[in-house]
Design a protein with these regions (language model features):
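Negatively charged, low-complexity tracts enriched in Asp/Glu with abundant Ser/Thr
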Residues: 1-30, 63-87
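Amphipathic, interaction-prone secondary-structure segments
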Residues: 17-51
């Protein structure tokens, strides 16, 4: 199932500030929803290195901002797109 353009835009508006705060060189590319509507795939890129981050769609809807940022940070660190925590 496809996300509506409005939903994609709202997800982008919510995620971009977190990505920029973690690393200003990270770029949000696209967001997709899996066929079972369980996971969001968030495609980001740093320099010439794209990566896909996974967010539980149901959890994302009600996830507090601090938890969302921590989730993004952890996945980016595992993928070696950012260094140690910037807290």
């Amino acid at each position: 199932m496809e996300l509506t353009p409005e939903r994609k835009r709202s997800i982008r508006q919510r995620l971009e500030p977190h990505l920029a705060a973690l690393d200003p060189t990270l770029h949000f590319i696209e967001v997709i929803l899996d066929s079972e509507r369980r996971n969001l795939g968030v495609i980001v890129q740093k320099d010439d290195r794209p990566a896909m981050l996974r967010l539980d769609f149901i959890r994302y809807v009600s996830m507090p901002e601090h938890e969302l940022r921590a989730t993004l940070e952890e996945q980016l660190r595992v993928k070696k797109l950012i260094g140690n925590s910037r807290k």
